[in-house]
Amino acid sequence: MEEKGLTVSAYDLREMLEKKEPVVVLDVRPKEQREEWQIPGSIYVDAYKRLNANDPAVLDEIELPTSGKVVTVCAAGKTSKIAANELRKRGIEAYSLEGGMKGWSLAWNTAWKQFDGFSVCQVRRTGKGCLSYILSSEKEAIIIDASLPVDVYAQLIKQHQLSVKYVIDTHIHADHLSRSKELAEYFHAPLYLPSNNKVQFVFNPITADTVFTIGSFVLEPIPTPGHTFESTSFLGNDEILLTGDTLFVDGVGRPDLKANSEEALNKSKLLYQSLQTLLSLPGEVIVLPAHTGKAVDFDEKLIQASLGKVMKSVPMLSLSEEDFINTLLKRIPATPENYLSIVDKNLKGDFSDINPVELEAGANRCAVS
């Protein structure tokens, strides 16, 4: 483990959690920050104000193991250093998470599942809830909705001896920077985006006739406007359904980003019709969304559900069009931080003048349930 004094990097903590090493993650942030997002498996103590008021006795109120490591975490890595130092005075091997939750935002893990003739690797950005996919068959691969640095996907592709044939985005994302353009350039693979968008770089447009084939696996686009006008879902071998931000396992996409009230209403109508299209598919089809609203455990289990199960667990999907639209617009969550800047960067495809961690900071707020 690479240490800098009292600190441990997000990379090292990710490795510890992935390898199931004995480590306790202690969250000392204000409660409202904890409720927005957290590190999976972490424990919480409401210590932020007292630690900053030079009252470390608050740490005596929790039971921590006397062996193994404890990693303290706050928003940016300052208060957690106070906590780690105090715990060391108590004989505990404690470290502060370098960069705090901002630094953790790029942490990731994976879940693999083998289907008949193809595999799905769900690459989960656990620090933010973004889900991307490596679909593979006969050593060829498609990468969809890349949200992490290129080296993450390069590592996984090399590890499984795959050749990238296509790189795809389901829509123009508003809560994270798309790494798909950079990824396509790295692998010398064609970049495909839905045709109805305003990006300012060269790409291959996805049309109703576009079909992606790798080995014995066939991926077909289904236009599903609503979350954005260009949003597209993808049906793979009639078994899996990649829904982007149109449909989640516990909710539906929001229609209001970059939209005034009239545009949000029109997009809500489009979203309803798109969902009806998806709900007409067989109930056993597996839904694979582009986001989740919860911190992703290091459990190697796909975040997925059958379409039939999603229909039963998301009450909004049973509403009439009018009731659906009214309910949707009443439940819109707070907008993602910096989403206008993120959309602008994704349209330009150039992130050279920004710090991605700073721009992407904040909770995932894509779903309405």
Predicted region positions:
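Accessory terminal helices/loops
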Residues: 1-7, 85-90, 110-111, 273-286, ...
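Positively charged, proline/Ser/Thr-rich regional signature most characteristic
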Residues: 2-70, 148, 359
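Conserved beta-strand hairpin/beta-sheet module of binuclear metal-dependent hydrolase folds
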Residues: 30, 112-160, 234-243, 250
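Active-site environment of divalent metal-dependent phosphoester hydrolases
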Residues: 31-32, 76-79, 150-151, 172-178, ...
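Catalytic cysteine-centered active loop of the rhodanese-like fold, especially the PTP/DSP P-loop
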Residues: 45, 56-102
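Active-site neighborhood of phospho(di)ester-bond hydrolases with catalytic His/Asp-centered motifs
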Residues: 74, 143-146, 163-173, 192-196, ...
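Active-site HxH/HxHxD metal-binding segment of metal-dependent hydrolases
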Residues: 85, 129, 141, 149-222
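A contiguous binding-surface segment within folded domains or other stable secondary-structure elements
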Residues: 237-287, 291
